[in-house]
C-alpha cells in the first residue's frame, strides 16, 4: 500500500518497480538523527541508538499490508505502551523485534523519497529527484518550487 498524504508529490512513474523490490517498509530517510537518542532514552534503553533505523518516514511510504497486519496482531500491546509516531514504531521497534521485517537501506530510501533537507538529499542522491517527496511545503520550499517548475508545475 502506498501511503501518500496530501502534502506529497510523485515525480516518477516507478510504483511497480518499488513494489517489486520486496521491502516490507520503505519511506524517505530521516536526515536529522537527534530524535533517535531521545527515542532510545525514552525507552530507557540508550544502547538502542546503535540499532535504530534512519529510514521510514511514514507520510510517503510503501508498506506490505500482510506483514503489517501480522505484526500488528503481535505488536499491539507494545505499540499501545509507546507514544511514538507509527512510522518510528514500524521502522525501529518492529525491525528490532522481528529482524526479518525488511526495511530499505538508506540509499534506496533516498531514491524512494525526500522529506528533511531536500537539497542535501538531492546531492546525496547524485543530483537525482526521488520517486516522490513528503512535506514539501515545510522543508525548503524554494528548492521544491524549482523542481516542480522543471516538471511543468507552478505552485
Task: Report each predicted region and the residues it spans.
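Short aromatic/hydrophobic "clamp" motif used to bind/position activated sugar donors
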Residues: 1
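Active-site acidic Asp-centered loop
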Residues: 4-5
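Conserved donor-nucleotide/metal-binding helix-loop-beta segment in metal-dependent transferases, i.e.
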Residues: 8-47
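Catalytic core and acceptor-binding pocket of nucleotide-sugar-dependent glycosyltransferases
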Residues: 50-155
Amino acid at each position: 500500500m502506498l501511503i501518500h498524504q496530501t502534502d506529497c508529490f510523485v515525480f516518477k512513474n516507478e510504483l511497480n518497480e518499488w513494489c517489486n523490490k520486496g521491502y516490507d517498509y520503505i519511506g524517505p530517510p530521516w536526515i536529522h538523527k537527534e530524535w533517535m537518542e531521545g527515542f532510545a532514552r525514552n525507552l530507557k534503553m540508550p544502547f538502542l541508538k546503535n540499532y535504530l533505523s534512519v529510514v521510514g518516514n511514514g507520510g510517503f511510504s510503501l508498506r506490505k499490508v500482510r506483514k503489517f497486519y501480522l505484526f500488528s496482531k503481535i505488536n499491539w500491546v507494545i505499540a499501545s505502551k509507546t507514544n511514538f509516531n507509527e512510522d518510528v514504531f514500524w521502522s525501529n521497534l518492529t525491525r528490532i523485534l522481528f529482524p526479518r521485517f525488511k526495511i530499505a537501506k538508506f540509499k534506496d530510501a533516498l531514491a524512494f523519497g525526500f522529506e528533511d533537507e531536500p537539497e542535501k538529499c538531492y546531492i546525496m542522491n547524485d543530483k537525482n529527484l526521488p520517486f516522490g517527496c513528503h512535506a514539501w511545503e515545510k522543508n525548503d520550499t524554494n528548492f521544491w518550487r524549482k523542481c516542480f517548475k522543471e516538471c511543468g508545475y507552478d505552485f
